[in-house]
């Protein structure tokens, strides 16, 4: 049933179709894609081919390498996203000339999921996001300033001299946030910052390669994918994708019908990587 739906998508688009379905993109996924290099080079000699991407994301470097490989095989390819291409899978789509996505489809921010380097971790769970650490610091800063302002107002209203009121307010506001700040390791924050910079550089390399003949998402605001969204789970739908200047289009009605079929069965498929065979009647290669 799954391969039948993939064949329908290929026939509808009338061009070669490479499929990348993974519940988590890692080094093994990269190896699977690389194993198709001969076939991808052959189809890449044509005008264009499609890559169907269905994944919530995965390892940053593995996703980057997959994106670079796809762009080496052809100067132009289009991404098909029937449902989800989140996080690192979104970065892969930056290598496309266009992303075909439904109203229900979603991309996602590139929020690197990293591990704390210290034994006693700041986060209780294994999943650790730089956004969470930076948001915690932002909240503490805003809380400290708000507390300082409120204390100054109370103390000056009670007739305390401004200098003394300021000293007292600073001391109280500092003591309020100090217990939390002491649990944040600057080393972790530095590591998180480096991971964010790595994500931005990877996005730039994929979206804006040195070769001007490669048709990629050159106009996309790729930094927004790393810096501008509040949480890792933020859904970048069709409208939001347009807002960050991604080249996107919606599928025609007949292709949307096939996408509907794909979404019904996609949750049952953990991994599928490879080219969809050409139709037996000798259709498009």
Label the model's feature ranges.
Residues 1-285:
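Terminal-region recognition feature
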């Amino acid at each position: 049933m799954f391969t039948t739906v993939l064949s329908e998508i290929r026939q509808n688009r009338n061009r070669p179709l490479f499929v990348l379905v993974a519940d988590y993109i890692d080094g093994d996924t990269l190896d699977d894609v690389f194993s198709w290099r001969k076939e991808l080079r052959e189809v890449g000699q044509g005008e264009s081919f499609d890559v169907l991407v269905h994944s919530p994301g995965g390892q940053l470097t593995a996703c980057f390498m997959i994106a670079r490989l796809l762009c080496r095989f052809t100067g132009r390819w289009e991404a098909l996203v029937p449902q989800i291409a989140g996080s690192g899978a979104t970065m892969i789509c930056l290598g496309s000339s266009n992303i075909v996505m439904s109203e229900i489809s979603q991309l996602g921010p590139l929020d690197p999921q990293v591990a704390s380097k210290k034994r006693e971790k700041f986060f209780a769970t294994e999943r650790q996001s730089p956004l969470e650490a930076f948001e915690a610091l932002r909240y503490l800063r805003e809380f400290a300033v708000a507390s300082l302002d409120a204390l100054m107002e109370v103390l000056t209203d009670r007739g305390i001299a401004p200098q003394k009121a300021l000293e007292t307010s600073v001391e109280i506001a500092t003591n309020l946030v100090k217990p939390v700040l002491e649990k944040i390791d600057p080393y972790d924050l530095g590591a998180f910052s480096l991971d964010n910079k790595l994500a931005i550089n990877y996005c730039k390399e994929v979206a804006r390669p040195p070769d001007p003949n490669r048709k990629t998402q050159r106009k996309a605001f790729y930094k927004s994918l790393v810096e501008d969204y509040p949480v890792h789970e933020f859904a970048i739908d069709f409208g939001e994708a347009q807002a960050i200047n991604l080249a996107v289009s919606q599928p025609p009605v007949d292709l949307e019908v096939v996408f509907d079929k794909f979404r019904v069965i996609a949750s049952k498929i953990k991994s599928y990587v490879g080219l969809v065979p050409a139709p037996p009647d000798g259709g498009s290669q």
